[in-house]
Design a protein with these regions (language model features):
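Conserved N-terminal Rossmann-fold NAD(P)-binding element of oxidoreductases
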Residues: 3-7
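Conserved Rossmann-fold cofactor-binding substructure of NAD(P)-dependent oxidoreductases
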Residues: 51-64
Length: 365
C-alpha cells in the first residue's frame, strides 16, 4: 500500500517510521519544512517538499497514492482533505476539531473513496473502546470517557509538560464541547465540569475539553442518558489554565498563549497516557458498571525511544490504516471511529502497542 504522510512533525515522523518497519507499506513524507524532512530522509524514508497550504500543489503531489495520512495541525485538515478528494486517494487524519470534522464529512459525501478523520488517541481509540463497552448493555445510563497525556514526573505549577501539538491543546481548551445530558445532545463549556478521582493511588482532576469523543454522541443518541468526555490532568492544572484563558483573556489571543507555552513549558518524552472509561446501565435485569483502563508509558518501539503520546497516537492511526488495508472497514464515504471493532484493534499488530507489546518482532526493513 502506497501511503503519503503529510506532516513530518513528531507524530507524522512516528507514523512513517512504524509503517515503514512492517515492510507492508511504501511511505513518502511530505512537508514544507525541509529540516523536518531531512530527519526522515536520514532514516531512509523518501520525502518531498510541498506547501501543505497549497491544495493544488498537494493534490498533484499525492496523485497515484493509495492513501493520505494527514498529521498536520487541525486548521489545515479541510484543505488537505480537499486535496485528497481531488487526487482520488483515501484520507485519514488525527484532528480533534469538531468544525473540521464536520467539513470533512461534507467532502466525503458521494466520494468513492474513504474519509476517516479522528484516528488518534482521543478522538480515536477512546471512542472505539467506549462504543464497545456501551454495546454490552441493554440499557445505557452513563458513558464517561477520560483521557490524559501527562508528564510522568510533574515539577512545575501547571503539573504539565508539552507532549503534543500546542495548537491542538489550546483549541480543545477553548472550543465548546459536545455531550449528552438527560438524553439530549447539547454543548457544554470547556474547562467546566471539574471532577476529581484517583487511580492506582494517584490523584487526578478532569474537566470538559472539546473534540475528544468524535462522533460518538451522534452514534449513541437516543440510547444513552448521559455521555461526556473530559481531559485528565494533575490537580490544580485546570484553575491555572482558566486564569490564563479567561481572566487574562488569552483565549482571544491564542498566538500570545502559544508563545508563552512554547517558551516556558518544557516538552518531555517521559510521559504517561491514561485511558479511563466507565459505562453503567442495565444488563440481564441488573444495574451494572463496567470499567476500561489503560496506562501506557514511554518505551522503545522499533528500536527507537518513543513517548507515550507518540505510541498511542501514531499506533492508533497505524492500526486503523492496517485494518482498512485488510478491508475490515468501509472502503468509501465517511468512516466513524466506532465502526472499528475493539477486538480487531487490540489484535492488530499496531493496536497491541496499547497492550504493552512491541513492533520489533514484525520489522522486516
Amino acid at each position: 500500500m502506497k501511503v503519503a504522510i503529510v506532516g513530518a512533525g513528531l507524530i507524522g515522523h512516528t507514523i512513517a517510521h512504524m509503517l515503514r518497519e512492517t515492510g507492508d507499506y511504501e511511505v513518502v513524507a511530505f512537508d514544507r519544512d525541509q529540516h523536518a524532512l531531512d530527519k526522515l530522509a536520514a532514516q531512509g524514508i523518501p520525502t518531498q517538499r510541498v506547501d501543505s497550504a497549497d491544495a493544488a500543489a498537494l493534490r498533484a503531489a499525492v496523485q497515484g497514492f493509495d492513501a493520505l495520512v494527514n498529521a498536520l495541525p487541525y486548521y489545515l485538515a479541510v484543505n488537505v482533505a480537499s486535496a485528497a478528494k481531488g487526487a482520488g486517494v483515501h484520507y485519514f487524519d488525527l484532528t480533534e476539531d469538531v468544525r473540521a470534522t464536520s467539513a470533512i464529512r461534507e467532502i466525503a459525501e458521494s466520494a468513492d473513496h474513504a474519509f476517516m478523520p479522528q484516528c488518534g488517541l482521543a478522538p480515536g481509540f477512546i471512542g472505539i473502546a467506549a462504543h464497545e463497552l456501551a454495546n454490552r448493555f441493554t440499557e445505557i445510563r452513563d458513558v464517561k470517557m477520560r483521557v490524559g497525556a501527562l508528564p510522568e514526573f510533574p515539577t512545575n505549577a501547571l503539573k504539565y509538560n508539552l507532549t503534543w501539538s500546542v495548537d491542538g491543546l489550546i483549541n480543545e481548551y477553548c472550543q465548546p464541547c459536545e455531550a449528552i445530558r438527560d438524553s439530549r445532545t447539547q454543548w457544554v463549556q470547556p474547562l467546566e465540569g471539574l471532577e476529581h478521582f484517583s487511580l492506582d493511588g494517584t490523584e487526578y482532576e478532569a474537566f470538559n475539553t472539546s473534540g475528544g469523543l468524535g462522533t460518538l454522541c451522534e452514534t449513541l443518541a437516543g440510547r444513552v442518558e448521559s455521555l461526556d468526555y473530559k481531559s485528565v490532568r494533575y490537580p490544580g492544572h485546570r484553575n491555572l489554565m482558566q486564569f490564563l484563558l479567561e481572566d487574562l483573556r488569552l483565549a482571544t489571543d491564542r498566538d500570545t498563549l502559544k508563545n508563552i507555552m512554547r517558551r516556558s513549558v518544557p516538552s518531555t518524552a517521559q510521559d504517561v497516557v491514561l485511558v479511563f472509561i466507565t459505562v453503567s446501565g442495565m444488563r440481564d435485569g441488573q444495574l451494572v458498571q463496567e470499567v476500561f483502563t489503560r496506562k501506557i508509558f514511554a518505551r522503545t518501539v522499533c528500536s527507537v525511544p518513543m513517548s507515550a503520546i507518540q505510541i498511542t497516537t501514531a499506533g492508533a492511526m497505524c492500526a486503523v490504516l492496517d485494518l482498512f488495508r485488510e478491508k475490515k472497514l468501509p472502503q468509501s464515504g465517511f468512516v466513524r471511529q466506532e465502526q472499528v471493532s475493539l477486538r480487531d484493534f487490540l489484535a492488530n499488530r499496531f493496536g497491541q502497542l496499547y497492550e504493552g507489546q512491541s513492533l520489533d518482532a514484525v520489522a522486516t526493513v
